[in-house]
Amino acid sequence: MGVVGVAHATSHFFHLLLPPLFPAFIEAFGLSYSQLGLLMSVFFVVSGVGQALAGFLVDRVGARPVLQGALACFVAAALVVASAQGYASLVVAAVLMGLGNAPFHPADFTILNQRVSSARLGHAFSAHGISGNLGWAAAPVFLIGLSSLAGSWRVAYVGAALLAGAVWLLVVLQREALDPPYEAARSSPPATEASAEQGAAMGRVAAKPLAAERLEALAFLKLPVLWLCFGFFFVVTAALSAIQTFSGPALQALYGLPLAASATVVTGFMLLGALGMVLGGFLSARIERLELTIGVAMSLSALLMLVVSSGAVSGPVAVALCILAGLGSGLAGPSRDMLIRRATPPGATGRVYGTVYSGLDAGFAVAAPLFGWLLDHGQPAGVFLGAAGAWLMGVAVAALIGRRLAHRRV
């Protein structure tokens, strides 16, 4: 769990490789917030498409080798940003970041489902979510802090490359902790092949046609609950996009706060989110109706965003409310992951998590340029209104998922 957590934190760190230093890119290359938001769309489109495909790759070759390749992409992305000469370089970096991010959820959840007992999975999912939030929390502090200390944003990205390289080395050194305990059995012929050999020896043809096997591998895509889970991730991560990427500029425009407040908001939001995930891990292990936990937690976060969007409070209070919204977001996390596990057919873990979590990438990809457009057109309150609306839609979708799963158990 520890190695998976560190790797997961790194992937979330690289979600925010670009946004904390958006002002530096505006100054260096003369870019707009819409253009910068489009960079995040490139990142998450590549990641979303790659994530769905990575689930099949993880099921076929194993999680750990895929994880190593992903971390290598992060190293390359940070080095490209460090040497960037314009917008095109940043687009290339966004593509590399997306390729690196794509395999993480199918790989991580495959490892956790293979290595952690069912009784401890709720806590494992909680720890996994916490590590992601810590990665998000660390990125603004690391990048803005190192940039300020060195007097150059390029040095900050060299530091990010070294960080990803260190985690890559950790994964290589700890490969035995990540490979499934039955790894040796994976190299033996699967049951269908063994049955075919036995049937051939008895004069029967028992092997499945290749086309039938492929259709069977895609059968999980017919499950309506799978696409509800995808939709849940889509709307919830649209809310996260507002906070992570544009809360700083929006607070500056709405309340006159300095742009440096963005680091405080994102870091505070993610740290309280991590605390929420600790508590949420216990809730997910004790409360059967997971959608109720999700509904209450995210409704509270949405309410706080509505207050911030009104402009009726002081700047420091607005910052505090944004940070406090992270607690509700975090509380919902472990219940969300357990809800998806209940919806996952046996033997399709990598494929399901890859498909469902690509909704995360799709949500970020669509939301980022929209929120950037709102800022460019003088509508900072729309950033917080959009976050509130997205969380409330997530509450509704979670209720639908819970209802479908309850009917399936009857």
Residue ranges and their predicted role:
Residues L16, F44-A52, A137, M270-A274, ...:
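Residue-level signature of mid-helix packing/kink "hotspots" within the transmembrane helices
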Residues L18-P19, V225-T267:
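Extracytoplasmic gate region of multi-pass secondary transporters
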Residues V49-Q85:
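Conserved MFS/SLC helix-loop-helix module at the cytosolic interface between two early adjacent transmembrane helices
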Residues A93-G132:
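Cytoplasmic helix-loop-helix junction between adjacent transmembrane helices
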Residues H128-D179:
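Helix-loop-helix hairpin linking two adjacent transmembrane segments in secondary transporters
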